[in-house]
């Protein structure tokens, strides 16, 4: 929000229209929709996410004007992995990988500002991401680098980020910086001086522990992501609609009641297909968090999902129905006390209540339960006595699936939570009513 406010304020105070716009947002793939939503919420501005459909024409949204003379769109969003696709024309693979070996798309010059979310992903000048972001940001009026962990390993992590910001010369240039601040076995020297110079040059930090009294003690946000199981999901959704039509047309109340359970099963199937399809996006998010030096609590339901996550993150610990009591306790103790244990994966039945996991202040849900109370209980594994930071909860929702609808019901209306206090039949009837409402236009 602060970056959005800063770029908007710069624009409003600029003597010449457009000094800070258009703006390019570079962020992890899982956060693109969130950035789009935040620009709309806090600045009232539409943002376009770059994809294959607008790969050749995205600039036209800025060049075309509305009746008041302003561009149709001034905010464009992409992820790190897509920089090559949208902004790099060619890379000379025969020569050493430097800025001179990269030919950028001329449309890069259109942007006047760049916001880089999770900028520690650009900390190496030897990677394509680091070089591409550097080239894109060169000569821009405003560049905002956002990260909770600007230094992941040692002081050398700041070099490329300062270079991207156009600030490395303020520290004497590369050689002087390395000599002054990267000496010794830990490549960290004159740390207090570096801290002072950063604060007085280009660095601003709001520590959660110091501003917690001004912030909500627990925040929730949903991240809409593409699923890799779209074809399978659409087929299952079509079957669901067919079944609901039969249910709707059934005249006998007893027949309708007997079909309640089947509708529940099919709704659960849709959730499962969506969950499997979100694994890729969730893995990218998890890598971003733990690579930034933070810990993460991750909740899911399916054994298949947990197995895939465990395969991607072999050092993660788990609290699931497959773990015995000793294994579960070991997982909790390791996560709480071992700084190298960054990820714990839990299902709701085994880990959703009772555990204290205050070593993390981030909780993510690749799947979520039917009830608000279960969601809240899971969130509170981190948000409990002993937690010093604001807790952030992330709900991953599959794009064009039932996820968003279910999330809204759970978080806002709490209809399902109320239903659970009744009998099983009441819960099933509630689910059927929700399904009928969700697919009403298709029945």
Where are these regions (language model features)?
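Walker A/P-loop NTP-binding motif
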Residues: 1-18, 132-134, 165
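Conserved Walker A/P-loop ATP-binding site and its immediately adjacent core
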Residues: 19-43, 152-157, 301-303
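Conserved P-loop NTPase motor "coupling/switch" region that bridges the ATPase
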Residues: 41, 47, 55, 67, ...
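Conserved helicase ATPase core of P-loop NTP-dependent helicases/translocases
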Residues: 57-60, 297-299, 307, 313-351, ...
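Conserved two-lobed SF2 helicase motor
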Residues: 69-90, 298-299, 337-352
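SF2 helicase catalytic motif II
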Residues: 96-145
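Interdomain linker/hinge connecting the two RecA-like lobes of the SF2 helicase core
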Residues: 119, 125-126, 155-162, 171-174, ...
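SF2 helicase/translocase ATPase core recognition
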Residues: 140-172, 177, 211-240, 342, ...
């Amino acid at each position: 929000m602060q970056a959005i406010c800063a770029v908007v304020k710069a624009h409003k105070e600029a003597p010449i229209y457009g000094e800070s716009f258009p703006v390019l947002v570079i962020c992890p793939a899982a956060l693109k929709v969130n950035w789009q939503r935040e620009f709309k919420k806090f600045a009232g501005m539409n943002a376009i996410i770059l994809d294959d459909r607008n790969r050749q024409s995205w600039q036209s949204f800025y060049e075309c004007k509305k009746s008041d003379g302003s561009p149709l769109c001034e905010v464009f969003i992409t992820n790190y992995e897509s920089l090559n696709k949208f902004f790099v024309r060619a890379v000379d693979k025969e020569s050493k990988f430097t800025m001179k070996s990269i030919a950028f798309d001329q449309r890069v010059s259109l942007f006047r500002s760049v916001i880089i979310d999770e900028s520690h992903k650009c900390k190496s000048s030897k990677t394509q991401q680091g070089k591409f972001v550097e080239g894109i940001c060169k000569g821009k009026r405003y560049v905002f680098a956002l990260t909770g962990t600007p230094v992941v390993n040692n002081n050398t992590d700041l070099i490329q980020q300062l270079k991207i910001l156009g600030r490395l010369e303020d520290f004497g240039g590369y050689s002087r910086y390395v000599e002054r601040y990267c000496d010794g076995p830990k490549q960290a020297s004159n740390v207090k001086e570096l801290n002072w110079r950063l604060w007085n040059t280009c660095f601003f930090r709001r520590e959660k522990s110091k501003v917690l009294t001004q912030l909500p003690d627990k925040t929730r946000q949903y991240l809409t992501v593409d699923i890799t199981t779209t074809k399978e999901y659409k087929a299952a959704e079509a079957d669901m609609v067919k079944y609901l039509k039969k249910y709707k047309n059934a005249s006998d109340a007893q027949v309708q009641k007997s079909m309640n359970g089947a509708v529940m099963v099919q709704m659960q199937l849709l959730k499962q297909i969506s969950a499997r399809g979100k694994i890729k996006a969730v893995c990218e998010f998890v890598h971003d968090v733990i690579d930034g030096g933070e810990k993460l609590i991750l909740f899911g339901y399916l054994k298949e999902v947990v197995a895939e996550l465990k395969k991607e993150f072999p050092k993660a610990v788990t609290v699931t129905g497959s773990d015995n009591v000793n294994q579960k306790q070991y997982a909790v103790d390791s996560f709480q006390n071992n700084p190298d244990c960054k990820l714990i994966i839990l299902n709701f039945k085994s880990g959703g209540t009772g555990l204290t996991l205050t070593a993390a202040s981030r909780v993510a849900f690749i799947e979520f339960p039917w009830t608000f109370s279960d969601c809240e209980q899971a969130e509170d594994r981190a948000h409990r006595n002993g937690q010093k930071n604001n807790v952030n909860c992330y709900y991953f929702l599959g794009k064009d699936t039932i996820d968003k609808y279910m999330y809204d019901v759970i978080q806002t209306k709490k209809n399902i939570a109320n239903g659970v206090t009744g009998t099983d039949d009441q819960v099933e009837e509630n689910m059927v009513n929700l399904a009928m409402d969700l697919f009403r236009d298709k029945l």
